[in-house]
Amino acid sequence: KLIDAGERVKVGDVLVGIASSGVHSNGFSLVRKVVSDNGLKLSETYPEIEGRTLGEALLEPTRIYVKQVLKVIAECDVHGISHITGGGFDENIPRILKDGQGVEVKEGSWEILPVFRLLEKYGKVGHREMFNIFNMGIGMVIALPEEDAAKAIAILEECGERASVLSRVIEGEGVTIK
């Protein structure tokens, strides 16, 4: 019944975020523009991306979370799942919420990957707008009761993923980044 997950998410649920491996093939129109407009070289390293070439950082393979998430579903009361793809947090998280529900995402509760800091700097994209374009280091979110959050995170970490509580579902609308 997870397909109708939006009907299960409740005010008070938390969102556990699973770290992304990078851009995950979304937002590449902007990426190409940033690279082109700034004369960036895919074969060069930049301080923002910590010793990797820009090409390596941009082409980091997309994480696939199926096995890990199935383990969480088997052991926790999952109310909703959202893959953070094109449209970032703003378009993807609301898909699992009912009307009248929103989230306040706690920036700093996960690592924003260096490649996003580079794109923000050179692309002169507003920080808040970055969350509307990119995954910003979160590839997927799982909505579940707060009492299941620690267990879900432990399962994900046992599978080699980085995960953390990003937000709580609140009364309201949309996604707020705090």
Can you name each region flagged by the protein language model?
Residues 1-47:
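Phosphate/diphosphate-binding glycine-rich loops and adjacent basic-rich segments that engage nucleotide
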